[in-house]
Amino acid sequence: MPRYPFRRFGFGALRRLLYLWVRSETINQSAFTLKIDRSKPVLYVLQQPSVSDLAVVDTECRKAGLPRPVMPVAVGDAIEPAAFFYLTPEPDWLGRQDKRGASPTLVRMLAAVGQNGLDDAQIIPVSVFWGQSPDSESSPWKLLFADNWAVTGRLRKLARILILGRKTRVQFSAPIHLRELVEQGKGHERTLRMVNRILRVHFRNLKTAVIGPDLSHRRNLVKGLLRAPLVRQAISEECESERISQEKAEGIALRYANEIASDFSYPVIRFLEVILSWFWNKLYEGVKVNHIERVQDVAQGNEIVYVPCHRSHIDYLLLSYLLFRNGLTPPHIAAGINLNMPVIGSILRRGGAFFMRRSFKGNQLYTAVFNEYLHTLFSRGFSTEYFVEGGRSRTGRMLHPRTGMLAITLRSFLRDSRRPIVFVPVYIGYERVLEGRTYLGELRGATKKKESIFDLFKVVGALKQRFGQVWVNFGEPIHLDQFLDRHQPDWQDQDLGPEYRPDWLPQTTNLLAKDVARHLNDAAAINPVNLVALALLSTSRQALDESALARILDLYLALLRQVPYSPSATLPDGDGQALIEYVKSMNLLAEQKDALGRILYLDEQNAVLATYYRNNVLHVFALPALIASFFQSNSRISREQLLRFARALYPYLQAELFIRWSLDELDAVIDQWLAALVEQGLLRQENDTFIRPAPSSRQYVLLILLARSVTQTLQRFYMAIALLLNAGQNALTAEELENLCTVMAQRLSILHGLNAPEFFDKSLFRHFIQTLLDLRVLRKDETGKLSYHELLGELAEGAAKRVLPAEIRLSIRQVALERPAEEAAAESNDAATN
């Protein structure tokens, strides 16, 4: 501190050196408009110890002709060596800081006024801000180093001076008269505490006004986690199981808490807004948002949990950006620990990310800290965001939800349900996903690589492409209390035990996960790329005459306008030809001209990528496509037969694609679709029978193209059933059947020239087998072998026979019969191992 002459000399040299670079000014000329009584002592108070801040204040005082803070000041008969003090005292020579103590200078000043007869003393709060307000700053680089609420280290302070020092601003506030406070007669100690409190509130309010609100809970929350009863219990158990001291176990828990917790920073949120505004409007052609009023309606008084689908790494930031731009608080976002890397991890953390390990298994202390952190967010009303799919979808389908975060949320709500929790599904649709090229290998069947945000940098070479628009649809909110009332009516009256883990939790969590997935799919944003991909991939060579493609696109649009998938789903503007021109402009279609017109087709690379975009909306068309499938091998079918066979197949389509309608609603919805198909000329109705068009007609071609949207899905179902029936009862385990299905699908794709790697995706077979088990069509014996109900045969010979052409069924049966099941299973296991 420059409290003595030789130190003031050093301080003067430092100030002159600083001002070789720094330029400062007062905010609103506040230094020139102060109303001070120069006959009475004037002291300046700064919030935190900082020599550079003090040098700036001293310079501005000299400019305005005010008493200088580094000069002595007479206080009655005594002399204070300098006319300033810090609200937070300076650290001692060991670097320790007593944040609870008052400044000795303030103590002496108050005593002089209250006890020693000094007429008055004036305290002027002064704040120094390096750089512009985050709301005024447009440079992303400067926003990264802008003033924030975190305690700043020396290195960061130096960087801030170098980067932001040319626009340093100083705010002088109106003086506080100690005489007015002393005359309240509260005594020295209480008055001292009151002055400190007034100054703390003043600095906080001013800082909020200038740099934005303090969004971070980290400084107060992290240590509080260790005091929570469930965490204390886990610490004690860690001491006992690992034979370590209490102090060491607490240190481990604190390390976990620091690893997990986010550290919201308003300047970083503004930094991300500036970067992303450029990104969405330069790389993409903007973001289209629908139904955001649903969030605004439930934001007040509820704990909001955003549950977006996960297509790209930029999903992490997109939702925060949109909410911030629409005046809503950005959420705390669950991110994988793999993203907590130098620089990027820090930006993500200050943008709201909290980090979680991929597995908590075997680490009870980490589990307790993480669960308590989530519970604290929920109970304090901080909005959160996590991806129920776990990882990014490489296939474009809605992945089967992972229930871990949902279970933690449910348990937290059971523990404290005073603040209602509302899940808000958010569907994010890209016309061209940024990581599309990196997904290409995995779509072709390559092993899935570990996720890394550096995947984004691998696509820099492709940034010259047109990426189209991004669509964000907010789905119908799910109120957790209402959900529990439906599925566990007496949940509020039950004794849930100390860990809030009732027996019904797993099953209820699974139901909640399926509800979330269906609500996400309900909010599908159907874009031109989705529709063109759906149409062309339904042809044998991914090619169509331009006029034929326009007709089927017009059909898709007409059907969805007549029978909307859901109130949350959205459609693109324009007719089929307009959609074609749009997709052509994105260089996703190849073209060949001849005397008869143009043929549009997908080249090999785009054909594989197109499966991704088709899968985004396959659930929307699954039911009308299933209805159309009944007319591939049947020229006519009665309504009763169609409904019976559709009811048999629908549960498996619904489970795979998370289709919205329940089995009870199915008949009525099928009637709507039948009416729409009749109106579009794709079917003709005679009494209770539906008849397809003549095979030579355009309408027949459109009907068959619609049917082919789900043909591969139905083929996979039939493969698994054929293999089971061929192997016999109690011959295969679920894993063996899954491997057999994969080998069989690979063989069929080669034999029939299918360029669709997801056709032999193991996970799809795995979930189909699980659905058969859930519906009790299959059972496991004590050794894990599968036995099947007679319904399986009826499914194969009844429903499947009606929806799959005879040549496809014959080909599948021939491959299934080629070798004994044991030999094929051995080969598939070898393939899986290698």
From Swiss-Prot:
Listed GO CC annotations: plasma membrane
Gene Ontology biological process terms from the UniProt entry: CDP-diacylglycerol biosynthetic process; fatty acid metabolic process
Pathway annotation from the record: Phospholipid metabolism; CDP-diacylglycerol biosynthesis; CDP-diacylglycerol from sn-glycerol 3-phosphate: step 1/3
Entry EC number(s): 2.3.1.15
Motif (HXXXXD motif): 309-314
CDD domains noted in UniProt: LPLAT_DHAPAT-like (cd07993)
Membrane-topology descriptor: Peripheral membrane protein
Entry keywords, A to Z: Acyltransferase, Cell inner membrane, Cell membrane, Lipid biosynthesis, Lipid metabolism, Membrane, Phospholipid biosynthesis, Phospholipid metabolism, Transferase
Record's catalysed reaction(s): sn-glycerol 3-phosphate + an acyl-CoA = a 1-acyl-sn-glycero-3-phosphate + CoA
Protein localization: Cell inner membrane
GO molecular function: glycerol-3-phosphate O-acyltransferase activity
Family: Belongs to the GPAT/DAPAT family.
Domain comment, as recorded: The HXXXXD motif is essential for acyltransferase activity and may constitute the binding site for the phosphate moiety of the glycerol-3-phosphate.
Protein name per the record: Glycerol-3-phosphate acyltransferase
Native species: Pseudomonas paraeruginosa (strain DSM 24068 / PA7)
